[in-house]
Amino acid sequence: MANKREFPLEKTRNIGIVAHIDAGKTTTTERILYYTGKIHKIGETHDGASQMDWMEQEQERGITITSAATTAQWKENRINIIDTPGHVDFTVEVERSLRVLDGAVVVLDAQSGVEPQTENVWRQATTYGVPRIVFVNKMDKIGANFDYSVSTIKDRLQANPLPVQMPIGAEDSFEGVIDLIEMKADLYDEDELGSKWDTVDVPDEYKEDAQARRDEMIEALADVNEDIMDKYLEGEEISNDEIRAAIRQATLNLDVFPVFAGSAFKNKGVQMMLDGVNDYLPSPLDVKPYKATDPETGEEIELKADDSAPFAGLAFKIATDPFVGRLTFFRVYRGTLEAGSYVLNATKGKRERVGRLLQMHSNHRNEIPEVFSGDIAAAIGLKNTTTGDSLTDPKTPLILESMEFPDPVIQVSVEPKSKADQDKMDVALQKLAEEDPTFKAETNPETGETLIAGMGELHLDIIVDRMKREFNVEATVGEPQVAYRETFTKQVSAQGKFVRQSGGKGQYGDVWIEFTPNEEGKGFEFEDAIVGGVVPREYIPSVEQGLKEAMQNGVLAGYPLIDVKAKLYDGSYHDVDSSEAAFKVAASLALRNAAPKGGAVILEPIMKVEIIAPEDNLGDVMGHVTARRGRVEGMEARGNAQVVNAFVPLAEMFGYATVLRSATQGRGTFTMTMDHYEPVPKSIQDEIIKKNGGNAE
């Protein structure tokens, strides 16, 4: 091996910092970089000077859009941090990062506790089996309440929080924290930017409460750890090291989630939380081996973090950097990779050369000669690689489990302000779509207009903004439109026969296909049930491809057809005239013939909406929901506000921010996430079909 590994694997942590928007996540990351010696001057998000938020729009809006990956060192550990956005429109970034992380720090706002986006991220982290610790931030804020925040972890996330600290004071009088393991208090010196604190005995007025909380912590550990349980029941002394080891084990098993308290803005509690990252979150050796498939044999292989094995990694993000061009962020799961060497993009079956390797500190780059197992780095020079691709040693191709991304729910038309910019705009949109799998750009074949689709209004605003800043293309944006879908509600069989035999080589393809509604979210499933070669083997992929392409254009109003099973069960062919192209056309004809009898309906995205408004405006808010074809699912009091949970069609939510602001004098807020699809009412379906010039029944 050319270079020596700087940090052993067990001293490496790959973590994400995740939170609801405004819980203080970027500030927390800033402080981590400051204390780990990476930054000399702290940048505040409210000044637009934060180190991690490196795109101009992020600094202007004070929110984090792309996950910057940064490497830092704390005590004897290397910590690779991925900062992730908290706004729902950018959930894909979070999903992407959780895929390549081993652990996460979930930041909560001490006044609000668990918020809607926290629930989404928590659910995603549970899906990927990511161990977490929780940092209850903003303890200095008015209304900060540590115990309330901890209770929301139980109530809203159905998770098992394990407070390992308690705060000393709150709001203006928040002075520090008590470590419930060591039973010592850390009091901060206001003037020293949090780099100095005194560790003292627990103040008398807190002793009883702290002891009771320590006992609760040990009881909770005894429930999930037999050794602790035995000692606890026998009344034996349990050492602090044993407690820490038990917390680590329980955290890795997702049995508990250690909770810390602090205020990143006021520089309090961040270092203790970093100790928690080292003490409780996994190294690449602690996580379950990653699964990959051998493309030749289909055999499943476990990738263990091991520098001596052949290289395997996953590209999880593409970013365009103004100085070095296209950056491919990737995680190394096995082996090592040197700059200048070749890798195989096993997903696309193409060899690529890695020009240079960089490790990013926010958007500063350090060039490195080699990366090792468990590392996160960025490569320059990979031209064909996109998000979710597997990169491996050319001699041992492997396909790593890829990522699944949600479909866009909203679309707008865009046209360049000057016609001369059309080509420039096409290039810009293509580059932006490469970076972001939830963003799509397409041209409407009938009207010739360019449509862009994404996860929400903010998402598309930012895309249009980036076109202007990074590619100098100014665009006019149309009204937002809903990305509807279509599906079948009945089982139906239909024939598709395509015959052309007039002079020269003819065309012949004939298929019988049975279409059945599929479960929601299952997408398109194709089954080959041909017996006796009535449709030859080599034409079957063309039938599937023909269906997929035809489904993109729908059967009612031109929207993609989803959640349908298609079973090819009969057909015929011609020795000379049959071709792949003819069977492709035949498949699309079968779909068209099935449509009238398949009970086709238009589906609309239904959003899960959480509206927070003052008690006095509750009546207005309920009225807003019902007027928008929504249904209220539940209500709860949160502090002195009311929280209304509802399901509302996306089509009815455009412009709602303005309505809510004026009804509540600016005090109401709402968040929404895509939840599921539902058929639109018949009257609205007919309108949509008429507007799109489709086939109303």
Curated annotation (Swiss-Prot):
Disulfide bonds: none annotated. Its main location: cytoplasm. One of its GO terms (cellular component) is cytoplasm. Belongs to the TRAFAC class translation factor GTPase superfamily. Classic translation factor GTPase family. EF-G/EF-2 subfamily. It comes from the Bacteria. Residues 10-285 form the tr-type G domain. One of its GO terms (biological process) is ribosome disassembly. Keywords: Cytoplasm, Elongation factor, GTP-binding, Nucleotide-binding, Protein biosynthesis. Catalyzes the GTP-dependent ribosomal translocation step during translation elongation. During this step, the ribosome changes from the pre-translocational (PRE) to the post-translocational (POST) state as the newly formed A-site-bound peptidyl-tRNA and P-site-bound deacylated tRNA move to the P and E sites, respectively. Catalyzes the coordinated movement of the two tRNA molecules, the mRNA and conformational changes in the ribosome. PROSITE patterns: G_TR_1, G_TR_2. It is found in: Cytoplasm. GTP binds at residues 19-26, 83-87, 137-140. HAMAP family: EF_G_EF_2_B. NCBIfam families: EF-G (TIGR00484), PRK12740.1-3 (NF009379), PRK12740.1-5 (NF009381), small_GTP (TIGR00231). This is Elongation factor G. The lineage of its organism: Bacteria, Bacillati, Bacillota, Bacilli, Lactobacillales. GO terms for molecular function: GTP binding; GTPase activity; translation elongation factor activity.
